[in-house]
Swiss-Prot record:
It is found in: Virion membrane; Host Golgi apparatus membrane. It comes from Bovine coronavirus (strain 98TXSF-110-ENT) (BCoV-ENT). The keyword Phosphoprotein does not apply. Homomultimer. Interacts with envelope E protein in the budding compartment of the host cell, which is located between endoplasmic reticulum and the Golgi complex. Forms a complex with HE and S proteins. Interacts with nucleocapsid N protein. This interaction probably participates in RNA packaging into the virus. GO terms for molecular function: structural constituent of virion. It is a multi-pass membrane protein. This is Membrane protein.
Length: 230
């Protein structure tokens, strides 16, 4: 005897159920979206490093969440058209995520900084202060960079880096590391304000995939590519 297979029932949402779901979860979704919006709006390195790190985590999680959703759409596609678009979106998302990791690893090899895995930018500014390398992300490679010292506190492009420095500690060159090349900025202007404050302006002078001589005597290290733990 042949058994008759009963098709599985297809569940569909009604308008009333959708409205009920929104009413039940509207407050929670609003709070979550407000939190994400505030983080994305005010997450800058020059304002709060803690908020900026949270922003980077949110941006980083976007890729795996997108890939998961596109794969889910492939498995539960409504029809062949949706399936085709879902497959394309999945492939694009995976390729872009792989490219992100490849570029981040290349930048990490160049700088040795975990900021290389920043999902927002591939530009890392580097400054060597008395043998200690500071690396921080910037959105773009500007034509000039400003380094400021206010009562011993070191700032670069408005980002606080450290304390206990004077104008005499500022190097002649700073760099911006990118995935494929290195940008060198030469100090073009230095002005002292008071006894413990002042600023220096660095102007872009060279672009290429090369190394700078070390400022540390006898160390044999390359200043621009110096590994750091800061």
């Amino acid at each position: 005897m042949s058994s008759v297979t009963t098709p599985a029932p297809v569940y569909t949402w009604t308008a009333d159920e959708a409205i009920k779901f929104l009413k039940e979860w509207n407050f929670s979704l609003g709070i979550i979206l407000l939190f994400i919006t505030v983080i994305l709006q005010f997450g800058y390195t020059s304002r709060s490093m803690f908020v900026y790190v949270i922003k980077m985590v949110i941006l980083w999680l976007m890729w795996p969440l997108t890939i998961i959703l596109t794969i889910f759409n492939c498995v539960y596609a409504l029809n062949n058209v949706y399936l085709g678009f879902s497959i394309v979106f999945t492939i694009v998302a995976i390729i872009m995520w792989i490219v992100y990791f490849v570029n981040s690893i290349r930048l990490f090899i160049r700088t040795g900084s975990w900021w290389s895995f920043n999902p927002e930018t591939n530009n890392l500014m580097c400054i060597d202060m008395k043998g200690r390398m500071y690396v921080r992300p910037i959105i773009e490679d500007y034509h000039t960079l400003t380094v400021t010292i206010i009562r011993g506190h070191l700032y670069m492009q408005g980002i606080k880096l450290g304390t206990g420095y004077s104008l005499s500690d500022l190097p002649a060159y700073v760099t911006v590391a990118k995935v494929s090349h290195l940008l060198t900025y030469k100090r073009g202007f230095l002005d002292k304000i008071g006894d413990t404050s002042g600023f220096a302006v660095y102007v872009k002078s060279k672009v290429g995939n090369y190394r700078l001589p070390s400022t540390q005597k006898g160390s044999g290290l390359d200043t621009a590519l110096l590994r750091n733990n800061i």
